[in-house]
Amino acid sequence: HNWQVEANMEILRGWTMTAAFRYTDVKQTSFNTTANEWQLRDKPLQNKFKGIITTSYQTPLKTWQFDLTAQFNGEGRMPDGFVVPEGSSQYTSHNGYIYHKWYPQLLGQITKFFRTWSIYLGAENMTNFRQDNPIVGERLEAKDERYVNPQSANFDASMIWAPIHG
């Protein structure tokens, strides 16, 4: 189930604002080996909600445009067997399941319009939010601890739910 609400408003001539909110309730049936039964639960790595607020200003001659977007990404359930990285505060637990917490992002763009083309300068993830240890596995001790051994039995690069670059 999904639902979305959006509102647009012109504050002043050339200055607009948009706010949107999306709620997602996606379930899946899976077998719980601990309880020895089938259960209906949240689909893994699916954000429960996303909110966006965008403000945009275009100059009177329409030669420049400035955009700023704040984005709020909701929590989502992690797959079964996921182990919270040591020292991480980016996760919480509900009803025995691990969820990643919500996180904000800020994006900006400046656009210069010419007669038949345009050029822009943009920035993403200006809040510098990054997922802790996005690649799961044993760390290589011989090298920098940031490196994960791709040959380790628990290596998993599919648990990405947030930006990994600032």
Task: Pin down the residues of each PLM region.
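C-terminal beta-signal and adjacent terminal beta-strands/loops
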Residues: 72-83, 112-166
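Alpha-helix C-terminal capping segments
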Residues: 7-8, 110-114
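Flexible, surface-exposed loop regions and adjacent strand-edge segments
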Residues: 30-42, 82-92, 135-145
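Gram-negative outer-membrane beta-barrel transporters
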Residues: 1-81
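Extracellular loop and loop/strand-boundary signature of outer-membrane beta-barrel proteins
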Residues: 2-4, 34-43, 92-97, 107, ...
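Residues that define the transmembrane beta-barrel architecture of outer-membrane proteins
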Residues: 1, 45-51, 102-106, 115, ...
